[in-house]
């Protein structure tokens, strides 16, 4: 594990380790708790998992928010728009009837060649971490309920590739479950294990 690895590295390199950068907060927190916190070595991760964000107050160096609130919204909004047969940008770059709208270039970018929306990452530091303590709060500018008379309930089947993943299970899916209600979507979530394609 990452916690064991940092112990091995510190035994080999001692005080030559000046900073720890991790590909995700799960590993970052394992290293922080096992070694970095006690040795006051700045440790950084990625995902803005709730435990990592809270640990910034205890010396965790920082993390990167994938803007999961915008990711989850975009996932379900594109589905809602397709099911309703409306312009794909409704509720994204163009306000819907409820007033839901995102700012292109600030909240997300659209890549026309890939026909893809991308939520923009945000740095989470000691200066702003308190704003990110609850990673499952819907993004305010797209948290308005659609009118069920104009946007009747639709059924959706959605696979979560690896439900054991901390980001997907603890942040992304809870956000999807909040947005599905706001967008009048009855979503059946299928939990994958990240390994077996048959499930």
Question: Could you tell me what each predicted segment is?
Answer:
Residues 14-18, 36-42, 58-62, 153-155, ...:
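Loop/turn elements at helix/coil->beta-strand transitions in domains of secreted/extracellular proteins
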Residues 48-61, 122-124:
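Flexible loop/hinge segments that line or gate small-molecule binding clefts
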Residues 1, 58-69, 189-193:
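Short beta-strand elements at the ligand-binding edges of bilobed clamshell
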Residues 1, 25, 154-182, 188-199:
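Extracytoplasmic "Venus flytrap"
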Residues 53, 130-135, 165-170:
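Short, solvent-exposed loop/turn elements at domain surfaces
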Residues 23-32, 56-57, 66-89:
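Extracellular/periplasmic ligand-binding modules, especially the Venus flytrap/periplasmic-binding
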Residues 1-54, 76, 176, 199:
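Hydrophobic alpha-helical
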Residues 78-154:
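Hinge/cleft segment of the Venus flytrap/periplasmic-binding protein
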